[in-house]
Amino acid sequence: ARVLTDDFLPAVEAAKAAGFNHFEAGGGARYQALYLYCREDAFDMMDRFRATVGPDVNLQTLARGVNVVGLDSQSSDVIDAHAKLFKKHGITTIRNFDALNDVNNLIYSGQCIHNAGLKHEVVVALMALPPGCEGAHTPEFYVGRLKSILDADLPFSSVCFKDASGTTTPAVVYDTIKAARALLGPDVHIQIHAHET
């Protein structure tokens, strides 16, 4: 996240020239790092990213539910302004998650994303428990969270199962996605995102 815009835009140009049409342009850490470490404005970076890839490329960022790009819960006016400002500065999709899978923390932020005219990629957060532990992190639990999203009538364009810890097993991912596909039908785009560091 602590990379100067001038240093990474040549790579974006090369990826665009190679035919890429979807980029993750940032998230909470990228937004914060520009101000805290790089002495750059996050909105200037978004504008330059958009200018580099052109008008037709999907630019995506990440939001932390009611925290949006902050580390604490934000007021409703800040959550709404976040969606509107990111739209204004060229973002087209926001992947919206709550690390504890509290659907209530996705409802207002997701509605703001949708109302701003952005694509809302709603997230179910995945992880594995330590060896020897049993509990909530099963395909049944994750599909239950997805059902809660559907029951909340939360508008979304796509669904992402996000494993930020990089610990979920392939079997859990397979069973979760298979059940989610049966629940969502064939037309909803499902994304799996994992941090495999």
Language model features: what each stretch is:
Residues 52-55, 115-118, 152-154, 182-188:
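Short helix-capping segments at alpha-helix termini
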Residues 142-156, 170-175:
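Phosphate/pyrophosphate-binding betaalpha-module
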Residues 164-197:
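Catalytic alpha/beta core domains of metabolic enzymes, predominantly
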